[in-house]
């Protein structure tokens, strides 16, 4: 898997399979107030132009509004022009004809920057000069993941940013790998993220989201720290990656005839249900033990009839 593909893949997985996570991000960027259960229509991401096909990261409709979000892992200088191109393709595709005249309305768009620096703008801007000399500035807001603390992510329910949170430590990977104190601080931070995520999910009632997001968090962390064994292994264990894998393996070994993928899904759902019950009953301090102690985990499965 290439450098940027893993980030695009994780982003699109959330957009396509956990679409409700996009709502708080849209509210944050465009100052809307959609409820989390608002109806979202996923539109196709392939837009055909005369000179070829354009593929966007996400195109959504809420009510009568179109939204377009691009996920960008690098600060590409051509991004502003590309956004005009993408948005024009989307607008053309959804054009309307009223009283004999076409109306081409551009979508509300933004760019999610997974990495950012001093030169990353708050808005991407392009001057459009029309044949009659009219000039307008096309502005697209940007979202910089690095500007959000873990606390602000949970306060604003921007759970969609969690898998990419680890990328702020990318440049200090060598130091963290060699410094046990810094490594422990990072692991403590991710233990806090895991606990906050569990509490958030126990409130929302979406128990399956716990394992889904954990899996994506681990996936990005594994890639970012692929050459840093201590960090990669530490984050994976804190977020429960080893346990999720063991659960799916155990179910398959018991001879479940539902196939590898379904066995993994059932194991993750079982663990997610147990963790959810612990949070609901105020036993969050037992989650870490559940993640690491097989016998204790089996005992609680029996206690909750899972």
Describe each model-derived feature in a short phrase:
Residues 61-73, 173-306:
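Short, charged alpha-helical interaction segments and adjacent helix-coil junctions
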């Amino acid at each position: 898997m290439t450098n940027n593909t893993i980030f695009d893949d994780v982003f699109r997985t959330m957009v396509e399979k956990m679409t409700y996570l996009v709502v708080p991000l849209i509210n944050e960027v465009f100052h809307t107030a959609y409820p989390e259960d608002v109806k979202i229509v996923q539109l196709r991401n392939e837009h055909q132009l005369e000179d070829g096909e354009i593929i966007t990261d996400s195109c959504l409709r809420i009510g009568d509004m179109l939204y377009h979000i691009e996920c960008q892992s690098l600060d590409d200088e051509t991004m502003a022009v590309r956004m005009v191109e993408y948005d024009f393709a989307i607008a053309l595709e959804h054009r309307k004809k009223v009283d004999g005249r076409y109306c081409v309305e551009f979508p509300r768009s933004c760019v999610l920057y997974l990495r950012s620096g001093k030169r990353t703008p708050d808005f991407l801007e392009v001057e459009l000069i029309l044949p009659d000399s009219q000039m307008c500035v096309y502005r697209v807001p940007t979202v910089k993941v690095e500007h959000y603390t873990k606390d602000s992510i949970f306060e604003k329910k921007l759970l969609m940013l969690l898998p990419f949170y680890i990328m702020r430590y990318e440049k200090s990977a060598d130091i963290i790998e060699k410094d046990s104190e810094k490594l422990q601080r990072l692991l403590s931070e991710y233990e806090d993220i895991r606990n906050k995520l569990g509490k958030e999910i126990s409130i929302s009632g979406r128990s399956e989201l716990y394992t889904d997001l954990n899996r994506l968090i681990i996936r990005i962390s594994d890639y970012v720290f692929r050459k840093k064994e201590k960090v990669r292994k530490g984050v994976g264990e804190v977020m429960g990656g080893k346990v999720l894998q063991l659960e799916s393996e155990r179910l398959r070994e018991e001879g479940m005839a539902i196939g590898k993928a379904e066995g993994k899904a059932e194991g993750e759902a079982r663990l997610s249900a147990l963790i959810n019950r612990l949070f609901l009953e105020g036993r969050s301090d037992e989650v870490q033990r559940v993640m690491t102690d097989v016998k204790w985990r089996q005992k609680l499965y029996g206690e909750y009839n899972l």
